Curated annotation (Swiss-Prot):
This is Probable 1,3-beta-glucanosyltransferase GAS3. It comes from Saccharomyces cerevisiae (strain ATCC 204508 / S288c) (Baker's yeast). Present with 16400 molecules/cell in log phase SD medium. Keywords: Cell wall, Cell wall biogenesis/degradation, Disulfide bond, Glycoprotein, GPI-anchor, Lipoprotein, Membrane, Secreted, Signal, Transferase. One of its GO terms (biological process) is fungal-type cell wall (1->3)-beta-D-glucan biosynthetic process. (1,3-beta-D-glucosyl)n 1 binds at residues 96, 168, 315. It is found in: Secreted, Cell wall; Membrane. It is a lipid-anchor; GPI-anchor. Belongs to the glycosyl hydrolase 72 family. The lineage of its organism: Eukaryota, Fungi, Dikarya, Ascomycota, Saccharomycotina.
Amino acid sequence: MQLSKSILLAALAATPSLVNAMLPIHIKNYRFIKPSSATNSESDNEVFFVKGVDYQPGGSSGYDADSDTDILSDPEVCARDAYAFQQLGVNTVRIYSLNPDLNHDKCMTIFNNAGIYAILDVNSGNYGESLNRADPSGTYDSLYLSRVFKFIDAFKNYPNVLGFFSGNEVINDQSDYAKIDPPYIRAVQRDMKQYISKHANRSIPVGYSAADNTDLRLATFKYLQCNSLDGNKVNDDLDISKSDFFGLNTYEWCSGTSSWESSGYDKLNSTFEDAVIPLIFSEYGCNKNTPRTFDEVSEGLYGGLKNVFSGGLVYEYTEEANNYGLVKLDDSGSLTYKDDFVNLESQLKNVSLPTTKESEISSDSIYKCDNSAITNIYSGFGTNNFTLPSQPAEIANMIEYGVNGTNTGKILTDYAVPTTFNYTIKNNKDDTISATISYDKANSLNELDVTATTVAKSASTSQSSSRSLTSSTSPSSSTGSSSSTGSSSASSSSKSKGVGNIVNVSFSQSGYLALFAGLISALL
């Protein structure tokens, strides 16, 4: 396709605006992949393991949709916690509830520069902000999805967003929830992934966090990761609705009393050996015995399970009523490390993980949707023969045209990220720590261009060999119809290469000059 001269001339007049940021994580088969540079070479990129914590200070009551604050709106708090995350040795946080209407630029920039990725739940416990497991058909509507799409808009431009969770423990063994909820989870994931492919500048993985129920979680996993009716060919409708990664909330290993065998960890490898999407523990850290020693870190998750699982997130960062915290916050906002913090820090320091290149990971990611295999595990599981609820016209319209959200976040170029903060941090001996945040230059490898999206989108059609991660261009939609029967080739883990199958164009200084020269040539 030829570029029009008007578009070419507009591009020549545009000046690139570059944002230094972390390189976004992508997926290949059952592994997360962290690019080693903006060239995104499979021979250099390495498998990424999540070493993280669940982060929701204040617990479920700490989120108020009517408030002008949430846990990522105060940069002073984020700087304090970024320091603690660095000392703990984590690279990822999971956040359960956020307000998509608030500005999160400073906090996400701090986390980016500190080397912290985020996995974000798109839902909250408020009315209209989640799928009601008791009434999925009545709550799968435009009110709910408009909030989900606004959430995606608010966070899609932060490269340190590792992924979104479409739901948390929606499918459980109460009532008939395992029967009625599964198709609606896939419907929400379909809608999210279609929206991302239409309105985001990159593929962002969409996953699901499963309840701590041994039989039900396996049935859920097989249902949510499948993308083929015959096991030989990917079905587009199934691929766009499958989970890109899968989280297990598991509390089976309790410090001091559990072992590899008694915890059931010895069965996890064989149970999930056929995974074609990344597996993590989205919550772990039994608190039956305190302080927790986290033996399951070195002996389990990053030990015997490391060939199948990709790490996990300890529950949880701050001490709440349920006594799972790693740190205690006082009324002034200052924090003190618990013994649990020190023990987890020690365990994470002693983790020894293999260095595996992306090129060593198979690209095969086909998994058969097998109704009998799923119902043999959990007889009451509702696959509905892998047919999904129809996509309401209002939702299809939002996917096509966007939700016109007023808040779209970005990494800041003119923000002097803080190295100190006005809170006191004490260790587990109650000694005050002299705290200074460090920022590794490696967290600014990605030069994101935030201009000239029209030209970049057009130019991408003639740059099929480019796999650069440095563009902020919006991919053209490949979904055709936004209806539930429409197909999409822009699934956020499609073919599990690069950042999905969306081709991006580099707009680093050298890349921009190369495009400039190409445009001149086209004009001539």
